[in-house]
Amino acid sequence: GKIHVLVGKSGSGKTTTAQVLMGLVPPTSGQVNLLSDGASLDLREVELNSWWRQLTWVSQHPAILPGSVRQYLLSAGACSQAELEKAAQVTGFDAVVAALPQGWDTQLGQGGVGLSVGQRQRLALTRALVNPSALVLLDEPSAHLDAISENQIVQAVLQLRAAGSTVVVIAHRQAL
């Protein structure tokens, strides 16, 4: 895998670039080419549902559906409890799980009610680690985290790359 970082001020088009990569908005000029088995494909010629199954978007404010922590993580793909725990350890979400009343079986409300924004970001990143996709887009993954947590995000990004994912990190500053 590879790591790419888009750094820029607010309003400079970083998130819009990610939306173009996801096929949500068309580019204002040019085209987006994807490599598939050595061949270049124009994103406009790719069936979007197929493309979306190959990417993961971790936003600043991730959408968390109601259900347990375990259910949310397993919705990314089947894995063992040990794999869940390993992914959570990398992102630091294991400490959050340890503090939850029912641990992995704690029920989350719509939007992740019961978790802070930073905890929701860690949960979404843990989900990305559980089942790495071909393209992982991280929008300000450390926006709501402290410096220690930023190191965990870096470790998660490196693990995604090692799993073969192309990771695009969107950031306002180069610190990450």
Short names for language-model regions:
Residues 61-67, 77-78:
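Conserved Q-loop
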Residues 26, 31-53:
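ABC ATPase NBD Q-loop/coupling interface
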Residues 5, 49, 53-60, 168:
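ABC nucleotide-binding domain signature
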Residues 22:
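Helix-to-loop junction immediately C-terminal to a conserved catalytic motif
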Residues 16, 56, 72, 106-176:
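ABC-family ATPase nucleotide-binding domain "signature/switch" substructure
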Residues 12:
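ATP-binding Walker
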Residues 7-9:
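The feature captures the beta-strand-to-loop junction immediately N-terminal to the Walker
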Residues 31-37, 70-110, 154-155, 159:
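ABC ATPase nucleotide-binding domain helical subdomain, centered on the C-loop/LSGGQ "ABC signature"
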